[in-house]
Design a protein with these regions (language model features):
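Bacterial N-terminal signal peptides
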Residues: 9-21
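Short glycine-enriched loops at secondary-structure junctions
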Residues: 71-76, 96-99, 125-128
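Conserved functional hotspot residues or short segments at active or partner-binding sites
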Residues: 122
Length: 225
């Protein structure tokens, strides 16, 4: 029995990474936690995330998410499922095309500044309808509100076309999806001063990724946030 106890403690010491963020101990590196959760999802070994009565009661008293996720509204890409996380783990802001407006930016600021999530991720996804619609956008094709949203994606489309002559439309869409996620992260950084402030203090990491339906995996811009 003692040997088993010691062995368990050794495993815990080897696997638990600790860091201090605003005086709070985070058991696992947040980026690693997302990657491992996505790996479980892609391998069809997602954990059971149903909540017990005790867990629901605990959540009713407050939340301590470890990441703020900006994602698309597309019904096929729920971050909680893709990253195999439970209620209270992720603070999520979703708009079509993983774009951001004033209210989304305010929500992101709340996530990183008040909920103190140590990780901010912008996640796009393959076959994004909003990015596809932003190609060859014509005046009057969509309602004013939809047109305004798609115009936020147009810079990524233009970048993809200008930087990749000779690529097929399908390839350009894939490239624009990745660029759009990167552009959105830059916009967030430019318009939410807390992002740079927290990054400079070492209290916030950022990253972008694109979810692929065929593999179930999120392809990250970099291995380190």
């Amino acid at each position: 029995m003692r040997a088993r106890f010691v062995f368990s403690n050794v495993l815990i010491c080897l696997t638990v990474l600790t860091s201090v963020f605003f005086g709070t101990v985070i058991a696992v590196d947040p980026m690693q936690q997302l990657q491992e959760g996505n790996r479980r999802f892609a391998n069809n070994t997602s954990a059971n995330t149903s909540l017990s009565q005790k867990e629901r009661e605990k959540l009713a008293t407050g939340q301590t998410p470890f990441a703020t996720i900006v994602a698309c509204s597309d019904s096929r890409v729920p971050p909680e499922i893709i990253f195999d996380q439970g209620a209270g783990d992720l603070f999520i802001v979703r708009l079509a095309g993983n774009t951001v407006d004033e209210f989304a930016l305010a929500s992101i600021e709340y996530g990183i500044s008040y909920l103190r999530t140590p990780l901010l991720v912008v996640m796009g996804h393959a076959n994004c309808g909003a990015v596809k619609a932003a190609f060859n956008l014509k005046e009057g094709e969509f309602s004013p509100k939809l047109t305004a949203l798609l115009k936020n994606i147009e810079p990524a489309v233009k970048q993809a076309i200008d930087q990749n002559p000779g690529k097929s439309q399908e390839e350009l869409v894939d490239i624009a999806i990745k660029l759009n996620a990167q552009n959105v992260l830059k916009e967030i950084t430019d318009r939410v001063p807390a992002v740079k402030e927290l990054k400079d203090k070492g209290k916030l990491s950022v990253n972008t990724g694109v979810f692929q339906f065929e593999t179930g995996k999120v392809e990250w811009q970099s291995d380190e946030a």
